UniProtKB/Swiss-Prot annotation:
Residues 670-993 form the PDEase domain. This is cGMP-specific 3',5'-cyclic phosphodiesterase. It comes from Drosophila ananassae (Fruit fly). A lipid is attached at C1155 (S-farnesyl cysteine). The modification Cysteine methyl ester is found at C1155. The lineage of its organism: Eukaryota, Metazoa, Ecdysozoa, Arthropoda, Hexapoda. It is an enzyme of class 3 (hydrolase). The active site is at H746 (proton donor).
Length: 1158
């Protein structure tokens, strides 16, 4: 280290500009550039902040040179032992000012800086001190930094000598705050980044190289006074976190402070009420190496209970003991002196406490080395003061060691968690891995796991037999009854004290000896996993009855399985004597301590027992060991439980496969049916009326429905286009029909009608021009399969009842099931109509089928409707994009699914009755099973509201859909027109219900409307109604009128007419009718008859224009109510024709022109 003196203002002031031993002096001109050197060395421009920092650094350098010169010289003189003193003055050549009028300040600065560094280097090589810069030089450099920072940067990068840069860097480092290396971060990061081999070792092994360096620098430390030495030794241990290195430093440093010959350090261990001391390092001198001290302490472990010996007494009383003559003190143990030949004279033993005042260790020093025979008061005070700081360091080191152990424990548990899923099909490997990790972490000699076979236990206990059989263990099914024992009877027995954790209050009891023996005889273990030493492989065996009855370890395990409690046995011999067990001498002699814990499953049922046998250091298992071992037991239980679940899942999958095979066999059409359909002649499409939107299946028998499906495939040229074998197609159609349940509406015939509507939309509606052949195939398949295996209940019912389907599919429950059934049939042997498709085409058609079937969920319809309407409003006409095509197919599927609403009235009202009956059946189930009130459309008690609900269904779903479709594709207008016509019919019936009529009193919907009936020769006591059909001619009405005249009274309940309700009848007609009826009832003979009613109706109709848009429903209503009305048979519909023929022709012409234009 070099001191530099420079005259300033005529005075001589020495300045020390270095901060570390061995560094070289740096001229102040160079040091003023400290703030800019870091950035300039990397050739980056200086920012304004850098400029200001450089200026501040220059000023600080000058101030430091003047203000702290004397203190630095004193420190330098103390540290220098070679009498190297600084010169009193510097050379005048060291000073150099900037030439006046220099046109290039930057160049001047460069020249000046170069000159200064050159002179400094020459002076140092010549052994002469350098001179300090004047304040004027500092100001010039600061101004130069502000005006021309690029010039200084250029000089640093291009012309500065390496020596100057090195000194500049040293000066920057010296200006930084003093920072001692932190062992916390370095040690922990080193340990985490180390290889697995290093991680398995204690983290203290990484710090062996960083052992105390005090013996090497002893001469230097001896030159310090007592106060400085004390502080230096405190710094030496302040940041040390490796417990072994720390203890070694403490003993060596204490020897330096007190001139003690050797020392020992004991750390407190054990539970709060069972404390003992463990010799961390013993008999350490100032020349003892750390490795030797640690090795000796680990091989010759010394354990001293509190209150025993000198160290034990200090730990118990927390009082210092200073013995002048050890051999005269009864507490002194001279055995070690006799073994080593060393004679102990003076002993100073002092406790080490933490900030709470608890004992964490005891330090002991022996014999003085400076000729004194005893430790005086000064030694005691120094010892006490130093140990106060050492207590903080020891506690920090212990906390660090605990954090490292916790980190490793967490890593092990994380690996075990991964192993649970990696080894879920191999219980032996999983249990062996868990035992290996537990043995290494807890440092025990042996580890065992007993598994209980629960085949004969109560339901819910689980199984492990199948998992055991997978690794070759053939065990008998032995029941194990595990009972938790509660309550305490009498005083605590000696047995209970022994099996508790060491010196812990007994908290567990058994009911009686007989009860315990009885349970023990019933508990049997079927599998035993044993893991011995480090290089021993795991042993898996099936213990016999005799082995279980004679093995002490098995007896302890049975006790734990019976009570379900953890036991920590510190004296196995005492446990054996207490239980009068048959000794297995080899087993007992080698067993000292046992930690035994139950393994439970998710239902808290004991499925096994885990045991740890003998700690490696011979001490009992602690409460901390039990806590760690509990985590291993939990993971072991999770692994066994997961293995059981995996086994059960495999079994269930196997059962499902068998069930699917059986289902596939029974769900597939027979060979005889297939051959018969294959040989049948298929009529043309016109025979089945397939091209018409008014198609009905009422006239078709079951075989005809299959033939009609085949005809649709043929007409679309799908059989030849995709090379579908004809027998495969026939078998598939029959299998699809077979997989529909015989529910009232969502059955095979509904699927046929949906498929026919799709066929009519593609052919008659000319929508096939927007579809590829593969998409047409997918749409027809989807229509036929869209309600496969329908149960007659909707998605909401599946969710309410928490059915397996609802658990399997959370959204669109039934639709997903329909698609799965479709896939199941296609995968059945001889039913794959897609077998000739390429993989790409197969994926494409299956995607179309899935999307189309899921689109039949009305929730999906409402989700897609707005996007579809937006495309239509924007004038979309191509429909070839993937998303556009998906939207179009979804709307088409919904239109086909509800197409019954557009059928002719005689078909529609029958289908509505079927839908209503199916809904009412679901409502009955909701009342019976769920005890809830169903919605109106499923409530049988509100059946009269069905016409009104039909009108709402048409208005909300059907009409908006068909309107936008026919606006875009005018060839499907019949669907829209048919829906409008049926809406008028349903609205008419809804008005009848409001008048008090009942439309659905009968088992079938053939006679939905009630009419007036009166006999001329009988007195009218009330207005009676008879039921006639809607689609009937005059002869049919008269026939039905004669039949209904014999209808019993109880079948005509609710047939009173309420004149207070408004309906289709005009106000004038109701008034006239009311007056006529009541006037006729006042006479002896009534004059009311059907003709009288007809006359009033005719008068009312004559008063209104037949083309009025607001009256067709009323006219139609009265036409159906009049038995002899001439309009009742018009069109075979029983409705009054209110539109002129010319108007219909005009509409037809306009529609034809629009179609031709498109």
């Amino acid at each position: 280290m070099t001191d530099v003196s420079a005259p300033t203002g005529g005075a001589t002031s020495p300045v020390d500009i270095t901060a570390s031993p061995g560094s070289t002096a740096l001229p102040p001109v160079a040091t003023t550039s400290a703030a800019a050197s870091a950035s300039s060395s990397q050739a980056k421009p200086l920012t304004n902040g850098a400029k200001k920092a450089a200026t501040a650094a220059a000023a600080a350098g000058a101030e430091e040179g003047g203000a702290s010169a004397s203190n630095q010289v004193k420190q330098e003189q103390r540290r220098q032992s070679n009498n190297n003193r600084p010169a009193a003055s510097g050379t005048p050549e060291a000073k150099q000012a900037t030439p006046a009028g220099n046109p290039d300040p930057g160049a001047g600065s460069t020249s000046k800086s170069s000159s200064i560094h050159t002179q400094t280097s020459q002076q140092e090589r010549a052994g002469r001190p350098t001179s300090s810069a004047s304040q004027h030089d500092v100001d010039e450099v600061a101004r130069l930094f502000e005006e021309k920072p690029e010039a200084f940067e250029k000089w640093l990068t291009e012309r500065a000598p390496p020596e100057a840069l090195g000194r500049l860097q040293e000066f920057i480092e010296s200006r930084k705050p003093l920072k001692r290396p932190s062992v916390t971060s370095d040690l922990f990061q080193q340990w985490m980044a180390a290889s697995p081999t290093v991680q398995q070792k204690s983290p203290r092994s990484l710090s062996n190289s960083s052992a105390s360096s005090i013996p090497e620098s002893r001469r230097h430390l001896m030159d310090l006074d007592e106060g400085e030495l004390f502080m230096e030794l405190i710094r030496d241990v302040a940041n040390e976190l490796d417990i072994d290195v720390l203890c070694h430093k403490i003993l060596v440093n204490v020897g330096l402070l007190t001139h003690a010959d050797r020392g020992s350090l004991f750390l407190a261990k054990g539970a709060p009420n069972n404390k003992y001391l463990v010799a961390k390092l013993f008999d350490v001198t100032q020349k003892t190496a750390l490795k030797d001290a640690v090795t000796r302490a680990s091989t010759e472990e010394i354990i001293i209970p509190f209150g025993i010996g000198i160290a034990g007494m200090v730990a118990q009383t927390k009082q210092m003991i200073n013995i002048k003559e050890a051999y005269k003190d009864a507490r002194f143990n001279c055995e070690i002196d006799l073994k080593t030949g060393y004679k102990t004279n003076a002993i100073l033993c002092m406790p080490i406490c933490n900030y709470e005042g608890d004992i964490i260790g005891v330090a002991q020093i022996i014999n003085k080395t400076n000729g004194c025979m005893e430790f005086d008061e000064h030694d005691v005070e120094i010892f006490r003061r130093y140990l106060t700081f050492c207590g903080i360091g020891i506690q920090n080191a212990q906390l660090f060691e605990m954090s490292v152990q916790e980190y490793r424990r967490n890593q092990i548990l994380l690996n075990l968690a991964r192993s649970i899923f990696e080894e879920q099909n191999n219980l032996e490997c999983l249990v062996t891995k868990i035992m290996t990790e537990a043995r290494e972490l807890l440092k025990c000699e042996r580890c065992s796991v007993f598994l209980v076979d629960l085949d004969c236990c109560e339901a819910g206990c689980g199984r492990v037999g199948g998992a055991m059989r997978r690794f070759g263990v053939r065990s008998k099914q032995v029941s194990a009854i595990v009972e938790h024992v509660g309550g305490r009877r009498g005083n605590t027995s000696h047995l209970e004290k022994i099996i508790e954790k060491p010196n812990q209050p007994a908290t567990r009891a058994i009911k009686s000896a007989d009860s315990f023996e009885e349970k023990k005889m019933r508990n049997r273990f079927t599998v035993l996993f044993e893991l011995g030493g480090e290089y021993q492989a795991a042993n898996v065996s099936r213990p016999s009855t005799s082995e279980l009855s004679t093995s002490t370890l098995a007896q302890i395990a049975q006790f734990v399985a019976t009570t379900g409690q953890t036991v920590n046995i510190c004296d196995v011999h005492e446990w054996v004597r207490e239980h009068n067990q048959i000794r297995a001498e080899s087993e007992i002699d080698s067993t000292q301590a046992i930690l035994c814990m139950p393994i439970v499953n998710a239902k808290k049922t004991v499925i096994g027992v885990a045991q740890l046998i003998n700690k490696a250091n011979g001490v009992p298992f602690t409460e901390s060991d039990a806590s760690i071992f509990e985590a291993f037991a939990i993971f072991c239980g999770l692994g066994i439980h997961n293995t059981q679940m995996y086994e059960n899942a495999c079994k269930l999958m196997a059962k499902q496969k068998v069930a699917l095979e059986c289902l596939s066999y029974h769900a597939t059409a027979s060979q005889d049916q297939t051959e018969k359909l294959t040989q049948d002649a298929i009529a043309d499409a016109d025979t089945y009326n397939l091209y018409s939107f008014t198609f009905t299946d009422f006239e078709l028998v079951d075989d005809d429905t299959c033939r009609a499906v085949l005809r649709m495939f043929m007409q679309c040229n799908l059989v030849s286009q995709f090379q579908i074998p004809y027998d495969v197609l026939c078998r598939w159609v029959l299998s699809v029909r077979k997989n529909y349940r015989p529910v009232k509406y969502h059955n095979w015939r509904h699927a046929l009608n949906v498929a026919q509507t799709m066929f009519a939309m593609l052919k008659t509606g000319k929508m096939e021009r927007f579809m590829t052949d593969l998409e047409i195939l997918g749409l027809l398949v989807a229509c036929l399969c869209h309600d496969l295996d329908h149960r007659g209940t909707n998605n909401a019912f599946q969710t309410k009842t928490e059915s397996p389907l609802a658990i399997l599919y959370t959204t669109s429950t039934m639709e997903h099931h329909h698609f799965d059934q479709c896939v199941m049939i296609l995968n059945s042997e001889g039913n794959n109509i897609f077998q000739a498709l390429s993989p790409e085409d197969y994926r494409s058609v299956m995607k179309t089928v899935e999307s189309a079937i899921l689109s039949t969920d009305l929730a999906m319809y409402f989700k897609k409707r707005n996007a579809f309407l937006e495309l239509v409003e924007n004038g979309e006409f191509d429909w070839q994009g993937e998303e556009k095509k998906d939207l179009l197919c979804g709307m088409m599927m919904t239109a086909c699914d509800v197409s019954a609403i557009a059928k002719p009235w005689e078909v529609q009202h029958k289908v509505a009755k079927l839908v209503a009956d199916e809904f009412f059946d679901q409502g009955d189930l909701e009342k019976l099973q769920l005890n809830t009130q169903p919605v109106a459309m499923m409530d049988r008690e509100r059946k009269d509201e069905l016409p009104k609900m039909q009108v709402g269904f048409i208005d909300v779903i059907c009409l908006p859909l068909y309107r936008v479709l026919c606006d875009t594709f005018p060839w499907i207008t019949p669907l829209y027109e048919g829906t409008l016509e049926n809406r008028r019919n349903w609205q008419d019936l809804a008005e009848k219900v409001e008048m008090g009529l009942t439309w659905i009193d009968h088992d079938t919907i053939d006679k939905p409307v009630e009419e007036f009936a009166a006999c001329a020769d009988e007195e009218i006591k009330d207005i009676e109604f008879t039921v006639t059909t809607l689609n009937c001619n005059q002869s049919q009405q008269s026939q039905h009128g004669s039949e209904d005249s014999h209808t019993p009274e109880h079948q005509r309940s609710g047939s009173r007419l309420s004149m207070k309700k408004t309906g289709a009848l005009g106000k004038a007609v109701r008034s006239k009718l009311s007056k006529t009826l009541y006037n006729s009832m006042d006479g002896s003979k009534p004059k009311t008859s059907l003709k009288l009613l007809e006359s009033h109706v005719s008068e009312d109709m004559d008063d209104k224009s037949p083309t009025s848009p607001s009256q067709p429903q009323a006219a139609g209503s009265m036409g159906r109510m009049s038995a002899s009305s001439s309009t009742s048979s018009a069109g075979g519909q029983g409705q009054c024709q209110v539109a002129a023929p010319g108007q219909a022709q005009d509409k037809s012409k306009k529609r034809s022109k629009l179609c031709a234009l498109l």
